[in-house]
């Protein structure tokens, strides 16, 4: 039963880290990356479809993405979806493909993006700590119910704390890498 707490807490913390990584990947750094367009959905035959399902996004060069479109009839829909996204991108039709130049970032925009990422990191840390709190509450309830001993309670809480510390370090590492990436340009 304590193992179940470890497993569930670990799974929840992994989901939190994955969600934070996705948020960080969606922040534009001025360098071309196909992940930048992962949040774009295209209105295609009456339903919203992820861009990556109807096209292939590749890095053309350091500051340019190239979208190879599977169905030529969706070209204008894809261009419209990119223009309507909050990414400040201006796609250009180039034959059957779409070229997306990635503009450089201003100092003001970099500072703003760093604040946003730091805020997201803090929210992820809070979520991790809440998972720890819930796990510790369950462990304390087991102690009150005399299901486990005090020694087992302390060992379990230490293990949960170690897990929490590891995941918070992962958040900090992702944050520092993205900050460096933003300040590089």
From Swiss-Prot:
Compartments (UniProt record): Cytoplasm
GO cellular component: cytosol
MF annotations from Gene Ontology: ribosomal large subunit binding
One Pfam family recorded for the sequence: RRF
InterPro entries (UniProt xref): Ribosome_recyc_fac, Ribosome_recyc_fac_dom, RRF_sf
Example GO BP: cytoplasmic translational termination
Domain of life where this protein originates: Bacteria
CDD domains hit by this protein: RRF
Keyword Protein biosynthesis: yes
Keywords for this protein: Cytoplasm, Protein biosynthesis
NCBIfam families documented for this protein: frr
Record family assignment: Belongs to the RRF family.
Function recorded in the entry: Responsible for the release of ribosomes from messenger RNA at the termination of protein biosynthesis. May increase the efficiency of translation by recycling ribosomes from one round of translation to another.
Name under which the protein is recorded: Ribosome-recycling factor
